[in-house]
Design a protein with these regions (language model features):
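Catalytic-core segments of class I nucleotidyltransferases/pyrophosphorylases
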Residues: 51, 106-107, 114, 119-127, ...
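Conserved beta-strand segments of alpha/beta enzyme cores
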Residues: 29, 78-80, 132, 206-208
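Active-site metal-binding loops of divalent metal-dependent hydrolases
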Residues: 15, 112-113
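A short, conserved acidic/glycine-rich loop-to-beta-strand motif
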Residues: 129-139
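Conserved N-terminal catalytic core of the sugar/cofactor nucleotidyltransferase
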Residues: 2-10, 18, 36-110, 121, ...
């Protein structure tokens, strides 16, 4: 399946407080991992998956990211930028703000996630699911982070990032797909988080689930940063094709 026409919204506008002092003067996307800015590793991975278009949703120190990565040509990518503006919009608000650049359907990933799975398979599952949104999940069993999803193999029954319980053996993998009309009733240019939006989608039976088998990596914490640095020094991100 060709993914060249599938845009990716990459949410990288947060303050990254858990990584301070590393992020006091630079955004999380520019934190060095295996001797390169983390965003460079993300772009190489996306390129290897056949993706060519990325919309960076930026807030805190976003101008530094644009200055370093420009139009993305050095990575074989077409990068566009969507800035929050005077106030940070949160993950949901930033996505709503970027909709004019995203088209009818698009991937969403987070600016601190490294997700080595098969994106074409995820896209095909979305096209077959008949719903306007799809969350990929991983059977985490509270190993690498707190599991926050109850999933029966076909449907996402519950999502709760704030108050997870033992019935939740899966975790939001961090790779999701939306149709743009999913956000039709969301406030424009007002802050909100995707974590607040998912339970409403579940209630309205609009959120499909798809299980991936590859574990996730993240740099949202010092531990995650060290773990990914170790991985990438031994197994670098895929080369650009």
């Amino acid at each position: 399946m060709c993914l060249e026409d599938w845009p990716v919204a990459l949410l990288a506008g947060g303050l990254a407080t858990r990584l301070r002092p590393l992020t006091e003067k630079i955004p999380k996307a520019l934190v060095k991992v295996a001797d390169a800015p983390f965003l460079a590793h993300q772009l190489r991975l996306l390129h290897a998956q056949g993706i060519r278009r990325v919309i960076l949703c930026l807030g805190y120190l976003g101008e530094m990211i644009e200055a370093q990565f420009g139009n993305g040509a050095a990575y074989g990518m077409n990068i566009e930028y969507s800035f929050d503006g005077p106030q940070l919009l949160g993950t949901g608000g930033a996505l709503k703000h970027a909709l004019p650049a995203l088209g009818d359907q698009f991937f969403v990933i987070y600016g601190d996630s490294y997700l080595p799975t098969n994106y074409a398979k995820v896209a095909q599952a979305f096209l077959s699911c008949g719903k306007p949104a799809m969350m990929t999940v991983f059977k985490n069993e509270h190993r690498w982070d707190t599991s926050n999803v109850e999933f029966d193999g076909k449907e996402i029954l519950r999502y709760d990032k704030t108050n997870p319980d033992k019935t939740m053996q899966y975790i939001d993998y961090g790779l999701n797909i939306f149709r743009s009309d999913t956000f039709a009733n969301c406030p424009g240019d007002k802050p909100f988080e995707l974590a607040e939006f998912y339970p409403d989608l579940i209630f309205r039976n609009q959120l499909a689930g798809f299980e991936v088998k590859e574990r996730f990596y993240e740099i949202g914490s010092s531990r995650g940063l060290a773990e990914l640095d170790y991985l990438l020094r031994r197994s670098p991100a895929p080369a650009q094709s």
